[in-house]
Amino acid sequence: MLNSKVTEEMKGHPDYWCDHIGKALNICQTIGSERMKILFDLYHVQIMDGDLIRHYQQCREFVGHIHTAGNPGRAELDDQQEINYPPIMRAIAESGYTGFVGHEFIPRAADKVATLADAVRLCDV
């Protein structure tokens, strides 16, 4: 699984292979194995490249798992962040994706379970 994370010090690892989603896609296409997949991290792709739906559609056949988080700050999914999850999740569902979506955010609220439940509801399109 190729992880689409950035190379900035606080957001990834120096010299990481897949600092842009296009690199992860190129590696998967070059390797040509059903066992090589992309961990499509919506938070990181938004920071690196933006245009989440288009980038997802370009590499959907290679996506093995999806992560969410609010941007900025990797906070919970709410109306205080820039990623509008319902249309993104609809596009992912309409593409035929049947895999898991992992919510990988850092909740600010005291009730962490309620925050997770809110994220699940927001993404359950």
Over which residues does each language-model region extend?
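Short beta-strand segments at enzyme active-site cores
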Residues: M1-S4, G102
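Surface-exposed cleft-lining segments at the edges of enzyme active sites
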Residues: K5-Y16
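Histidine-acidic metal/acid-base catalytic patches
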Residues: C18-V125
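Asparagine-centered polar/low-complexity signal
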Residues: N3-V6, R35
